[in-house]
Regions:
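Bacterial N-terminal signal peptides that target proteins for export
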Residues: 1-8
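Surface-exposed repetitive/solenoidal architectures
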Residues: 23-35, 49, 58-59, 64-67, ...
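Hydrophobic h-region of N-terminal signal peptides that target proteins for export
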Residues: 13-20
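Solvent-exposed, conformationally flexible loop/turn segments
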Residues: 39-52
């Protein structure tokens, strides 16, 4: 059936006779359908992993590539992962070693229609699938939705290849609407319609009347996804409308706790948000005084991604029920995103209100972005109203609340040497009441920083250019 199957089998046998003497093995690739195409094999030191950069990504018309497998059936337990479960700054914890010359088989996925709630729920059975929504669906009859795709605690520093239980497929909403998502109790601390997405895509989807109302610790929650991760340039949310969202959460601040609440995705590590619209409101009450970080924004919380041509209209209300420790707690809040790298041609409307108990919290609030990590914010505008009451340090910027020095050094390590805010506008004037240390900058909370030095040899410089400010 497969034109190159016999050839690969014969070649594999001949390679095996010499591999032991040479201490190398070869990985061959079978495209797993009737074709004359061929992919070059990869040579690997025997007993070592196949590096991530050696993984081929073939293309087949009408199908989506779904990974490499050790047998042509391409069952989940047969998946072969390249690289290792680590990033450039963490030690490897897991890998698949090539012990002998072998053949890997391509998995191909074709579009599958989704017409019922039951079919939507079943996509968790094939996380590489390509799904097309063909009807509007109402989820309000499900008291507590279980997210599709799971995040594991050791995912954070791993390539998306190793996010073994995340959604890695395509979900095309086809312009249809999913209404009435309900999350009333967390089954995982990364929650939404999807719990975790890794190198997957969500397109052309509308969501309305989502209700995320619960009490929990350490949540990363949003209507669409708890966490999105990409390494291949293909993780994306495009042309989606997530509107009428209500997020009401009471959470407790333990030592070193991270929380994230947004109208689209709790965190996004790489990938693209493009041509989307979000609206709604959130009410967050934070108990406990253990330190940590809080992220709140219309689109994304902890974010290192590209956001383009997105609009938001979100009311964000955050209350600290107890005083926070001095210098032990930070909150990053943005009308568009809590934190960001690259933002282009976006618009934010709405309101941000923060109230406390006169503690030592540090607040960084931006009309667009609470904390700009590294990159470029351009061509964007905010009219978000900001009000802060009874807190410690509160730094507000019309466009960005802060330029984060620590992440600026990290950006330099990635080769980004200039962080820029250009061609942006802010209309409004923040209100401070009983704030012990208020700071306001028309474009950035503390203005344009001095350049940063970097231990990697490349520093970070900052530039604010061609921005405009009006009080009303």
């Amino acid at each position: 059936m497969y034109s190159n199957r016999l050839f690969l089998s014969i070649l594999l046998c001949s390679v095996a006779l010499t591999a032991a003497a040479q201490h190398t093995s070869r990985v061959f690739f079978d495209l797993n359908y009737d074709t004359d195409q061929a992919l070059a094999p990869v040579t690997v030191t025997t007993g070592c992993m196949a590096p991530a950069e050696a993984k081929p990504y073939p293309v087949r018309e009408g199908y989506r590539f779904g990974g490499w497998y050790t047998a042509p059936e391409c069952r989940p337990e047969q998946e072969w992962r390249f690289g290792c479960n680590a990033s450039f700054y963490t030690q490897p914890t897991d890998s698949m070693c090539v012990e002998r010359s072998m053949i890997l088989y391509a998995k191909w996925v074709s579009p599958k229609p989704i017409r019922t709630v039951e079919e939507l729920d079943a996509i968790r059975e094939d996380l590489y699938g390509w799904y097309v929504l063909e009807n509007d669906l109402d989820l309000s009859g499900i008291a507590n939705w279980t997210p599709v795709g799971e995040y594991e605690g050791d995912y954070e520093f791993a390539p998306a290849e190793w996010w073994r239980h995340a959604f890695k497929g395509v979900f095309d909403g086809g312009g249809h609407t999913i209404r009435g998502l309900r999350i009333t109790e967390l089954t995982t601390d990364k929650s939404g319609l999807f719990g975790a997405i890794a190198d997957g895509e969500v397109l052309n989807l509308n969501m309305e009347d989502s209700r995320l109302v619960f009490t929990a610790e350490r949540p990363y929650v949003a209507p669409l996804a708890g966490i999105i991760k990409q390494d291949l340039g293909q993780a994306a949310v495009r042309n989606c409308r997530i509107t009428g969202t209500l997020i009401q959460v009471r959470t407790t601040n333990r030592e070193g706790t991270f929380h994230s609440f947004t109208g689209l995705c709790g965190g996004i590590w790489g990938g693209t948000l493009e041509d989307n619209t979000v609206s709604g409101r959130m009410e967050i009450e934070l108990a406990g005084s253990g330190g940590g970080e809080l992220y709140a924004g219309a689109y994304a919380g902890e974010a290192y991604n590209d956001t383009r041509r997105c609009t938001s209209d979100f009311d964000i209300d955050i209350r600290f029920a107890v005083p926070q420790p001095a210098d032990g707690f930070k909150a990053f809040i943005g009308g568009l995103q809590a934190s960001a790298t690259n933002v282009e041609d976006c618009t934010a409307r709405g309101r941000i209100r923060v109230s406390g108990e006169s503690g030592g919290e540090q607040l960084f609030i931006g009309g667009l972005v609470g904390s700009e990590r590294y990159g470029k914010v351009s061509g964007s505008a905010s009219t978000v109203k900001v009000e802060v009451r009874n807190t410690g340090f509160a730094q507000v910027g019309g466009i960005v609340g802060e330029f984060n020095a620590g992440y600026g050094v990290m950006g330099a390590a990635f080769g980004v040497t200039t962080t820029t805010v250009e061609g942006c506008s802010y209309t409004g004037k923040p209100v401070f009441r009983k704030v012990s240390r208020p700071v306001f900058g028309q474009f950035a909370g503390a203005g344009e920083p001095e350049p940063l030095a970097s231990p990697w040899g490349m520093g970070m410089s900052y530039k604010i250019d061609r921005c405009t400010y009006k009080t009303k």
